[in-house]
């Protein structure tokens, strides 16, 4: 199998090999990097797109584009001009709040069963997709994100793996002619096994509003002989309930009255009458069965029972896989009684308590309960009900959107969701049941509804797609952007930081890393050459909208797929273009390669290996160099083209494409020019002179100038808005408009524009923007700005945190050139000098352990015994880097010795300085007594007294 597939895609493998070779060559080219694709933020999705048509779409590539081989069951999509690439979040769950809706998965209803071996219950379950099996009425919050992703991958794997088995089963059952679409499950109706025909709820969609899902009891519908018609009748009544419920909720009596008086369409009435006739009481059917005995003509239903083969063929044409079971049921009268359920109540009237119009017939109890139930639902649920008003006139089901029918073989047939038929790439659509007289698109017409009103909340739809020659299946989607569907965007193998799948467009854009030197690129006759750095160059990313609004864009942009650029050299004749003048972006590659410009003789010192240069002079008129590299001149001008080649090496040769024209050639007559200028002269040039003029050197190297004679008048330019200034030469061919901005402003765009032969200016009017100095990068965490003005002549004022000081200018000025007057300053920590410990003293403090005495550091001083501190005992480091006080010193002192008994010491002090004397005064009756010579105690420098204190003794002791 693998070998057959490889042989089948052998040309494709060759094309892939060639593409890889081109990629390697392009990477070796230092000028461009076309393979890289940049991922930019996708335009924000905005609800409000019209309901897309469900159809089978085969992406048709351009002639020069490698075929992506992608097929989608999706909508007809449109790509806005300003859309390039996308990197959007993977959306799996359905939001539950109207303000949070960003995605929707909307499923059609259908009863085309694909497995005839299933019984009724299994057949009903086959209508439920893997995503729908877990949906219960009370659980609308979805599974965790990882479970949803795993379920999505497993579901795609099952669809791929089971395709061959299903094909074999159908071949054995004779179902090969039914096409591919019926093999796959239709995700439409959810079967509630505990429900009954009286508790039916509408199914068929998960809307973006709140994701409400409604269930229908399918068992009786599947037992019906005409399940599609039975389902339509049931759904019609449910829709009528929703309409009445909405009418009652809004309280518009007049609107409800009009709803009552509104007559249903003729075909709808005929269907209802047909259903009522089929659903008669069994006794009436028994009485009808006796009609032939009375000689009357049997009814149509009895004729169908008499011809079960016809009914079976009818179901086979419709693709119903349970035709055999229906065969047996059609033969049994008991089957007709089983499907004779009558829906109670008339939904075309209001309850009596509404008080509107005449007295209507009361609703049945169950209908009243249902009506009350729907009345308690949110507005989004009522929108979900209204959404089901499908427009069937054109065979479309506008509510049927983007659910996979899938498949592995990209060339097989597929059944459209519109029941339009079986699609074949060669034969187109083939009707599913062309011989069915009961199938009529006009009979399926229902009430037309403005789908835009029900689709305003849907902004994104996802679907599976087959990518590549091997049918690789990926999750793809379309988004509503600016009122148009954008896409398809298909999932990549990468994930973002949150674990969500990344999406990218099917076609890759071309990335340009840098434009080759001296090469001018134009898009739609508008220059996209980068602005030189001295003119306020800044890096910009390019989209299609940017291309239209900016004339000169720096390198590093993307060109969307399918769009082309025009290329020419800056100075025609001085540089020679190597390559094509037009390059097309084709699925990430340039077709052909990006050209380059090579210098000629005047730039290479007349090297023999260089092509000759061509100098151009125009008299009696102006000229313009077109984006395609053509020189346009007005009629009746004189054109002189000089081939620059040394005369001593030989004589070059001029040739031209207009072979029937004759021009004079020869060396220039001027004395200073005749040594290197071989001239071709065209006097009074006319339209017949248009063509390509080539100069060939004696060594065979050539250089050409394409000339076209044209007359054009460009639109008159109005005076631009201040501060932009315009100096206009005129608006004829080749005349220029020069723009200028005053000092302090930067010109954004081209400095001049030339009137081209097309009648358009080469560049749009530029704009003046106030020069802004670049953003200041504050790397120092202690540095802050207290004033900032980045405009010209503005200033930036800096400040450091407390405890730090500036090293550098405290203020920078923004100069008119757009640069700052100096570098950004820095902050340096403030420190004080370590103080010296005093003599006979000590120094202390917690700041000493930090080894840095910064602002706020505290230092304390103390003295040894016998010494007293002179000065402040503690000092602090201030913001100017100085101590708050001078360091203290220690002075020697004698302590207070205490009063002797019966006496007093004089003078009385706490401490005594060195050299102080003490005297003792005794109390009356006592006299001083000395143990030695009578000397007074003296305080010595070491802090000790010279002798003991005198004692006071009584007269008796003396």
Swiss-Prot record:
Glycans are attached at residues 376, 525, 605, 620, 752, 789. It comes from the Eukaryota. GO terms for biological process: synaptic target recognition. Residues 527-599, 712-770, 771-829, 830-892, 892-954 form the Sushi domain. Residues 612-708 form the Ig-like C2-type domain. Residues 139-149, 267-292, 320-333 have a biased composition (Basic and acidic residues). Its main location: secreted. Residues 1-30 form the signal peptide. The keyword Glycoprotein applies. SUPFAM superfamilies: Complement control module/SCR domain, Immunoglobulin. Plays a role in the formation of functional neural circuits from the early stages of synapse formation. Has a role in the development of CNS functions involved in locomotor activity. This is Locomotion-related protein Hikaru genki.
């Amino acid at each position: 199998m693998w070998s057959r597939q490889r042989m089948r895609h052998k040309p494709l493998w060759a094309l892939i090999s060639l593409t890889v070779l081109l990629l390697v060559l392009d990477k070796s080219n230092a000028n461009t990097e076309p393979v890289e694709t940049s991922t930019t933020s996708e335009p924000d999705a905005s609800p409000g797109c019209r309901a897309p048509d469900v159809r089978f779409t085969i992406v048709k590539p351009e002639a020069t584009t490698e075929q992506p081989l992608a097929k989608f069951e999706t909508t007809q999509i449109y790509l806005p001009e300003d859309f390039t690439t996308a990197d959007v979040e993977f959306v799996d769950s359905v939001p539950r709040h109207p303000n949070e809706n960003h995605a929707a998965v909307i499923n059609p209803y259908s009863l085309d069963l694909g497995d005839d071996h299933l019984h009724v219950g299994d057949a009903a379950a086959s209508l439920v997709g893997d995503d729908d099996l877990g949906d219960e009425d009370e659980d609308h919050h979805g599974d965790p994100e990882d479970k949803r992703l795993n379920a999505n991958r497993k579901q795609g794997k099952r669809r791929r793996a089971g395709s061959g088995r299903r094909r074999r089963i159908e071949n054995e059952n004779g179902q090969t002619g039914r096409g591919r679409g019926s093999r796959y499950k239709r995700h439409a109706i959810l079967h509630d096994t505990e429900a009954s025909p009286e508790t039916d709820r509408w199914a068929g969609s998960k809307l973006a509003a709140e994701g409400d899902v409604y269930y229908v009891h399918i068992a009786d519908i599947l037992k019906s002989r005409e399940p599609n018609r039975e389902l339509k009748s049931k759904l019609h009544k449910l829709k009528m309930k929703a309409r009445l419920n909405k009418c009652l909720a809004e309280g518009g009596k007049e609107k409800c009255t009009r709803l009552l008086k509104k007559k249903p369409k003729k075909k709808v009435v005929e269907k209802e009458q047909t259903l009522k006739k089929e659903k008669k009481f069994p006794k009436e059917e028994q009485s009808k069965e006796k009609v032939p005995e009375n000689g009357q003509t049997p009814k149509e239903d009895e004729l169908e029972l008499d011809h079960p083969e016809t009914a079976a063929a009818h179901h086979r044409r419709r693709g119903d896989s349970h035709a055999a079971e229906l065969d047996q049921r059609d033969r049994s009268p008991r089957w007709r009684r089983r499907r004779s359920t009558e829906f109670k109540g008339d939904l075309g009237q209001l309850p009596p308590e509404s008080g509107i119009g005449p007295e209507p017939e009361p609703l049945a109890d169950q209908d009243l309960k249902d009506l009350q139930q729907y009345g308690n639902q949110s507005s989004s649920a009522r929108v979900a009900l209204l959404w089901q008003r499908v427009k069937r006139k054109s065979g479309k089901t506008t509510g049927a959107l983007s659910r996979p029918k899938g498949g592995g073989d990209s060339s097989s047939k597929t059944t459209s969701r519109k029941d339009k038929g079986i699609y074949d790439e060669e034969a187109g659509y083939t009707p599913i049941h062309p011989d069915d007289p009961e199938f009529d698109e006009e009979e399926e017409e229902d009430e037309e509804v403005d789908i835009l009103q029900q689709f305003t909340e849907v902004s994104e739809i996802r679907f599976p797609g087959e990518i590549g020659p091997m049918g690789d299946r990926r999750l793809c989607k379309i988004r509503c952007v600016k009122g148009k569907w954008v896409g398809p965007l298909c999932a990549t193998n990468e994930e973002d930081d949150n674990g969500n799948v990344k999406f990218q467009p099917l076609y890759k854009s071309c990335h340009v890393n840098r434009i080759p030197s001296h090469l001018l690129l134009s898009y739609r006759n508008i220059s996209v050459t980068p602005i030189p750095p001295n003119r306020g160059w800044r890096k910009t990313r390019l989209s299609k909208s940017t291309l239209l609004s900016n004339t000169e864009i720096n390198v590093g942009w993307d060109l969307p797929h399918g769009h082309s650029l025009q290329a020419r050299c800056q100075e025609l004749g001085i540089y020679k273009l190597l390559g094509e003048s037009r390059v097309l972006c084709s699925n990430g590659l340039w077709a052909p390669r990006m050209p380059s410009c090579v210098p000629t003789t005047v730039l290479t010192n007349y090297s023999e290996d260089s092509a000759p240069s061509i100098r151009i002079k125009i008299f009696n008129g102006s000229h313009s160099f077109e984006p395609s590299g053509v020189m346009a001149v007005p009629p009746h001008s004189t054109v002189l083209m000089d081939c620059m080649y040394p005369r001593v090496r030989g004589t070059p040769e001029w040739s031209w494409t207009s072979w029937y024209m004759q021009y004079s050639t020869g060396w220039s007559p001027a004395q200073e020019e005749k040594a290197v200028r071989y001239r071709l002269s065209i006097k009074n040039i006319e339209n017949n002179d248009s063509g390509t003029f080539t100069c060939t050197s004696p060594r065979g190297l050539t250089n050409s100038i394409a000339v076209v004679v044209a007359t054009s008048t460009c639109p008159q330019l109005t005076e631009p808005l201040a501060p932009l200034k315009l100096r206009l030469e005129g608006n004829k061919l080749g005349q220029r408009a020069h723009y200028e901005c005053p000092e302090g402003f930067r010109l954004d765009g081209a400095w001049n524009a030339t009137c081209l032969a097309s009648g358009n200016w080469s560049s749009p009017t530029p704009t003046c923007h106030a020069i802004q100095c670049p953003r200041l990068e504050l790397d120092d965490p202690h540095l802050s700005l207290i004033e900032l003005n980045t405009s010209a002549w503005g200033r930036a004022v800096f400040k450091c945190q407390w405890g730090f000081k500036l090293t550098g200018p405290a203020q920078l000025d923004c100069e008119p050139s757009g640069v700052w007057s100096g570098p950004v300053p820095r902050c340096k920590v403030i420190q004080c000098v370590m103080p010296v410990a005093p003599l006979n003293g000590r120094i202390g403090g917690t700041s000493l352990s930090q080894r840095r005495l910064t602002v706020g550091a505290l230092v304390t001083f103390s003295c040894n015994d016998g010494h007293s501190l002179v000065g402040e005992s503690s000092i602090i480091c201030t913001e100017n880097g100085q101590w708050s006080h001078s360091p203290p010193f220690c002075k020697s002192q004698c302590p207070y010795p205490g009063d002797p008994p019966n006496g007093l010491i004089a003078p009385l002090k706490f401490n005594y300085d060195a050299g102080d004397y003490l005297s003792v005064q005794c109390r009356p009756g006592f006299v001083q007594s000395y143990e030695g010579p009578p000397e007074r105690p003296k305080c010595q420098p070491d802090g000790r007294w010279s002798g003991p204190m005198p004692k006071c003794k009584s007269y008796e002791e003396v």
